[in-house]
């Protein structure tokens, strides 16, 4: 099976099947701003990004501070969204909440870099599809209480934060799934560099829930 990330690329473009980046909008404290499909902006002091090609099947809601929720049922398309930072860095990211996928879905730290153009995932949990399928193994390392397997894959002429491009995906996939904890992104970046996986200059970085042709729900808080 082809990973749904191979069908979608990033959400500011917005993770995977996007055609063009969506402009950042200022924070607005209204119910409309809290439930806006296919948008990016700020909410509760955090950057957020959400995209879906099936708005009638999925609902994304921004909560206070770093909280967000997403629910989807019999979704025949794709969706991805979450909260984090407009500019990524080697920060420690704390998160907690409820993640209940039924089918193909990821819970991950997700981001992009430029020069080189890299799309990256630190996968903390997933549904029925393991993202390592079809990817190239680059080793493993241990951090935050678990072994993570490292992989790379290539996207050819795919949507990205720089338009349609060919680029590399970096993956860290946690062996022991979890829905709360701390992610030392700096340790992942160092392990990737040691494995010859070199990042560029950081673009956005979020805790994301992604789904493809599945059902499920999640309520997460990031800090």
From Swiss-Prot:
Protein origin, superkingdom: Eukaryota
GO biological process, one term: effector-mediated perturbation of host innate immune response by symbiont
Nuclear localization signal as annotated region, ranges: 174-184
InterPro entries in the cross-refs: ConA-like_dom_sf, GH11/12, GH11_AS_1, GH11_dom, Glyco_hydro_11
EC number(s) recorded for this UniProt protein: 3.2.1.8
Catalysed reactions, semicolon-separated: Endohydrolysis of (1->4)-beta-D-xylosidic linkages in xylans
Residue stretches making up the GH11 domain: 34-223
Keywords: Carbohydrate metabolism, Glycosidase, Host nucleus, Hydrolase, Polysaccharide degradation, Secreted, Signal, Virulence, Xylan degradation
Keyword Amino-acid biosynthesis: no
SUPFAM superfamilies, per the entry: Concanavalin A-like lectins/glucanases
Location(s) in or outside the cell: Secreted; Host nucleus
Gene Ontology CC: one annotated term: extracellular region
Associated pathway: Glycan degradation; xylan degradation
Chief location bin: secreted
Keyword Signal: yes
Job of this protein: Endo-1,4-beta-xylanase involved in the hydrolysis of xylan, a major structural heterogeneous polysaccharide found in plant biomass representing the second most abundant polysaccharide in the biosphere, after cellulose. Acts as an effector that localizes to the host nucleus to contribute to the virulence process. Induces host innate immunity responses; triggers BAK1-and SOBIR1-dependent cell death, salicylic acid signaling and jasmonic acid signaling. Does not exhibit any cell death when transiently expressed in N.benthamiana.
Family named by the database record: Belongs to the glycosyl hydrolase 11 (cellulase G) family.
Identification of the protein by name: Ethylene-inducing xylanase 1
Phylogenetic lineage: Eukaryota, Fungi, Dikarya, Ascomycota, Pezizomycotina
Gene: EIX1
């Amino acid at each position: 099976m082809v990973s749904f990330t191979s069908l979608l690329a990033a959400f500011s473009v917005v993770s995977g099947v996007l055609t063009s980046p969506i402009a950042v909008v200022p924070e607005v404290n209204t119910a409309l701003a809290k439930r806006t499909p296919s948008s990016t902006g700020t909410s509760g002091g955090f950057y957020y990004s959400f995209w879906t090609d099936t708005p009638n099947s999925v609902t994304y809601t921004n909560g206070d501070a770093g909280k967000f929720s997403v629910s989807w049922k019999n979704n025949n398309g794709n969706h991805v969204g979450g909260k984090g930072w407009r500019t990524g860095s080697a920060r420690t990211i704390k998160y907690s909440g409820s993640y209940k996928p039924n089918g193909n879905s990821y819970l991950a730290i997700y981001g992009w870099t430029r020069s080189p153009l890299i799309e990256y995932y630190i996968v903390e949990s997933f549904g029925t599809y393991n993202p390592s399928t079809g990817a190239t193994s680059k080793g493993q390392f241990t951090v935050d209480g678990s072994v993570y397997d490292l992989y790379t894959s290539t996207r050819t002429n795919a949507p990205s934060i720089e338009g349609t491009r060919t680029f590399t995906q970096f993956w860290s996939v946690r062996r022991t799934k979890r829905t709360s904890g701390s992610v030392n992104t700096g340790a992942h970046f160092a392990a990737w560099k040691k494995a010859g996986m070199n990042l560029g200059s950081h673009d956005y970085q979020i805790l994301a829930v992604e789904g493809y042709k599945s059902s499920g729900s999640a309520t997460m808080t990031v800090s």
